[in-house]
Amino acid sequence: MQYNLTRIDPDAPNEQYPVGERETVTDQLLEDQVHKNIYMGKLEDVLRGAVNWGRKNSLWPYNFGLSCCYVEMTTAFTAPHDIARFGAEVIRASPRQADFMVIAGTCFIKMAPIIQRLYEQMLEPKWVISMGSCANSGGMYDIYSVVQGVDKFLPVDVYVPGCPPRPEAFLQGLMLLQESIGQERRPLSWVVGDQGIYRAEMPAQKDLRREQRIAVTNLRSPDEV
């Protein structure tokens, strides 16, 4: 008696003994319970997410203003806007107790060294919002005594346009900063410094909403929006 040995291929079609198609049946309820009660990932990601959640919801702003945009910024601390909803209402009188600075107004060259010194005294990690056209690019003051943008000597995280920006615009910039902080990956120790820090790329809002603005047909005044 002779035998022929052949290798079995489970995926190959078998004309003599046809097999039905294989389908994987999943239990959605079981999968939901597994993902709800069992974490499948790195513990480092959980710890980083918890730290970023605490950082973005407990920003300590430094009470510092330069010009008329500062009036609009302080308006955001009043009851109609209630910046306390975002955990950033505790204004600090000393830069050593703050981790968040808003450059609101015109930055003159004489003020630049003072602002930089205050920034260096702030706690790590720290963030900066440039509020208003003058802080962003010098505004209408294209003269020798005005710095043409605070990003010439400070790292800026969020730019808020306007002359001056409304309090709602400042709150939107604060929310964008919180979103960016939530995606950061940085060492958990403040002693390490800026090395090994990953910040998510933040595209301009005018680019993200370009199609939405073009599609608008009914124009309304700012008071009606």
From Swiss-Prot:
It comes from the Bacteria. Binds 1 [4Fe-4S] cluster. Its EC number is 7.1.1.-. The lineage of its organism: Bacteria, Pseudomonadati, Pseudomonadota, Gammaproteobacteria, Pseudomonadales. It catalyses: a quinone + NADH + 5 H(+)(in) = a quinol + NAD(+) + 4 H(+)(out). Gene3D superfamilies: 3.40.50.12280. It comes from Pseudomonas putida (strain W619). The keyword Plastid does not apply. One of its GO terms (biological process) is aerobic respiration. It is found in: Cell inner membrane. This is NADH-quinone oxidoreductase subunit B. NDH-1 shuttles electrons from NADH, via FMN and iron-sulfur (Fe-S) centers, to quinones in the respiratory chain. The immediate electron acceptor for the enzyme in this species is believed to be ubiquinone. Couples the redox reaction to proton translocation (for every two electrons transferred, four hydrogen ions are translocated across the cytoplasmic membrane), and thus conserves the redox energy in a proton gradient. One of its GO terms (cellular component) is respiratory chain complex I. It holds the Pfam family Oxidored_q6. The gene is nuoB. Its main location: membrane. It is a peripheral membrane protein. Its cofactor is [4Fe-4S] cluster. Keywords: 4Fe-4S, Cell inner membrane, Cell membrane, Iron, Iron-sulfur, Membrane, Metal-binding, NAD, Quinone, Translocase, Transport, Ubiquinone. [4Fe-4S] cluster binds at C68, C69, C134, C163. Belongs to the complex I 20 kDa subunit family. NDH-1 is composed of 13 different subunits. Subunits NuoB, CD, E, F, and G constitute the peripheral sector of the complex. One of its GO terms (molecular function) is NADH:ubiquinone reductase (non-electrogenic) activity.
